[in-house]
């Protein structure tokens, strides 16, 4: 009899769902993500506006780093990987170098980086936004072009950060519809 009672308890517990406020974090974040998406992008844009003029003045190059092919990757099947790789690119390569170009912007760049990290964390919690494995050739091209520009690459990449935010928004909008 004790084993059947244990089996009954296990079946009962398996059917019990958590109350409304007790969903696992990732499921809750996925449910509320459409609401927070607009807020996160607004915060990213506001943080970027604090450093945008600095980098626009320093960027003397006519070429575009974040090309149409990258934007197409964001809208296509490689969108997940392009987003993931570009966030990593800005956090690991661009922003640390950018901090060295002006102590007056370091605090604002740190704030921008933290907001980007928060976005990445929220995207990862809701697996349908970052379920990716493949590499994006467009991101590789951006990285190669960035490295070829040497010191000027930082100015170019930071000057085009608003294009990156627009790519993030386009990607998330597509994912919200699917």
From Swiss-Prot:
Database matches in Pfam families: IL10
Cell compartment(s), UniProt: Secreted
Keyword flag Phosphoprotein: no
Membrane-spanning ranges: none
SMART domains, A to Z: IL10
Positions annotated with a glycan in the UniProt record: 134
Signal peptide positions on this chain: 1-18
UniProt keyword terms in alphabetical order: Cytokine, Disulfide bond, Glycoprotein, Secreted, Signal
MF terms in GO: cytokine activity
Highest taxon above the source species: Eukaryota
Annotated GO CC locations: extracellular space
GO BP annotations, alphabetical order: immune response; negative regulation of B cell proliferation; negative regulation of cytokine production involved in immune response; negative regulation of inflammatory response; negative regulation of interleukin-6 production; negative regulation of membrane protein ectodomain proteolysis; positive regulation of B cell apoptotic process; positive regulation of cytokine production
Presence of keyword Secreted: yes
S-S bridge residues: 30-126, 80-132
Family named by the database record: Belongs to the IL-10 family.
Purpose: Major immune regulatory cytokine that acts on many cells of the immune system where it has profound anti-inflammatory functions, limiting excessive tissue disruption caused by inflammation. Mechanistically, IL10 binds to its heterotetrameric receptor comprising IL10RA and IL10RB leading to JAK1 and STAT2-mediated phosphorylation of STAT3. In turn, STAT3 translocates to the nucleus where it drives expression of anti-inflammatory mediators.
Subunit structure, interactors included: Homodimer. Interacts with IL10RA and IL10RB.
PANTHER family per UniProt: INTERLEUKIN-10 (PTHR48482:SF5), INTERLEUKIN-19-RELATED (PTHR48482)
Protein name: Interleukin-10
Species this protein is from: Meriones unguiculatus
């Amino acid at each position: 009899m004790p084993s059947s009672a244990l089996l009954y308890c296990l079946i009962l517990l398996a059917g019990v769902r958590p109350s409304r406020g007790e969903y696992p974090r990732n499921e809750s974040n996925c449910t509320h993500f459409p609401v927070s998406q607009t807020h996160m992008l607004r915060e990213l844009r506001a943080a970027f506006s604090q450093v945008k003029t600095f980098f626009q003045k320093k960027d003397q190059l006519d070429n575009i780093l974040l090309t149409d092919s990258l934007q197409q990757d964001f809208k296509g099947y490689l969108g997940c990987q392009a987003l993931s790789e570009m966030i990593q690119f800005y956090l690991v390569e661009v922003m640390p170098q950018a901090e060295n170009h002006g102590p007056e912007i370091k605090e604002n760049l740190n704030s921008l980086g933290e907001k980007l990290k928060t976005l990445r964390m929220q995207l990862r919690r809701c697996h349908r936004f970052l379920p990716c494995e493949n590499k994006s050739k467009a991101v590789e091209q951006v990285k190669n072009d960035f490295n070829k520009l040497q010191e000027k690459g930082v100015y170019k990449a930071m000057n085009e950060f608003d294009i990156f935010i627009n790519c993030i928004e386009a990607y998330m909008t597509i994912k919200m519809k699917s």
